C-alpha cells in the first residue's frame, strides 16, 4: 500500500499508563472495521494504514462485530489473526463462530461469484461449493474489489498470483460442509 497525500495514519500515543504502557486513540482503521464501513477501510488501506495498529486491531474489531467482508479483506492482506483478547477469547475461534452464523450472507454471494468471478477465474457453476471453496472465491472478489478501488492495473499475471491464497487461505477451518448444492 502506498501512503498518499501526506495523510498520517499511525498516530502517536496520547499518554502512558502508570506502568508506562502507551495509551492510544482508537485506530481509524479499527474503528471503520468495527462499524462495518468497507469503503472507509479500503480508503485507509489505500493510504497506507497499518492493519495491526492499536491495542484492538482492525481484524478483531471486524470479527467481534460480524463484518465478514472486512475480515476477509484484512486477513488476506496479512492481518495478525493470532492475538488473544484480554478476556481470553481467540480471534480465530470467534471468526469460525461468525462464519457459521453467517450462512445467509455467504449464500448471497453465490450469484455474485457466478456472475463476476466466473468470468475471471473460470468458476464452474455446476460444481457445489463447500465453505473452503466459497471463502477462496469470496476473498478473490474482495481482493479484486480492493485492487479496483486502488486503481491498480488488472493483468492475467496479477490474477494468477492470487492462486497462492488458495494454498494458504484459512487453513484453520478444516470442515468441508457443502453449503451450496
Curated annotation (Swiss-Prot):
Mapped ANK repeat ranges: 24-53, 54-83
Keywords for this protein: ANK repeat, Repeat
Keyword Repeat found: yes
InterPro entries named among the record's database cross-references: Ankyrin_rpt, Ankyrin_rpt-contain_sf
PROSITE patterns the record matches: ANK_REP_REGION, ANK_REPEAT
Keyword Repeat among record annotations: yes
Protein name: Putative ankyrin repeat protein RF_0782
Organism: Rickettsia felis (strain ATCC VR-1525 / URRWXCal2) (Rickettsia azadi)
Amino acid at each position: 500500500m502506498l501512503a498518499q497525500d501526506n495523510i498520517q495514519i499511525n498516530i502517536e500515543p496520547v499518554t502512558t499508563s502508570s506502568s508506562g504502557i502507551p495509551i492510544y486513540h482508537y485506530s481509524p482503521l479499527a474503528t471503520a472495521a468495527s462499524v462495518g464501513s468497507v469503503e472507509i477501510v479500503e480508503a485507509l488501506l489505500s493510504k497506507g494504514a497499518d492493519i495491526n495498529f492499536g491495542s484492538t486491531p482492525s481484524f478483531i474489531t471486524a470479527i467481534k462485530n460480524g463484518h465478514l467482508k472486512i475480515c476477509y479483506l484484512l486477513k488476506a492482506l496479512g492481518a495478525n489473526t493470532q492475538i488473544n483478547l484480554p478476556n481470553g477469547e481467540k480471534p480465530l475461534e470467534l471468526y469460525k463462530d461468525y462464519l457459521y452464523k453467517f450462512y445467509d450472507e455467504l449464500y448471497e454471494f453465490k450469484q455474485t461469484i457466478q456472475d463476476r468471478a466466473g468470468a475471471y477465474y473460470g468458476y464452474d457453476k455446476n460444481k457445489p461449493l463447500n465453505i473452503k471453496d466459497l471463502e477462496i472465491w469470496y476473498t478473490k472478489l474482495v481482493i479484486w474489489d480492493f485492487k479496483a478501488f486502488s486503481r491498480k492495473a488488472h493483468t492475467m499475471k496479477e490474477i494468477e498470483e492470487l492462486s497462492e491464497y488458495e494454498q494458504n487461505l484459512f487453513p484453520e477451518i478444516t470442515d468441508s460442509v457443502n453449503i451450496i448444492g
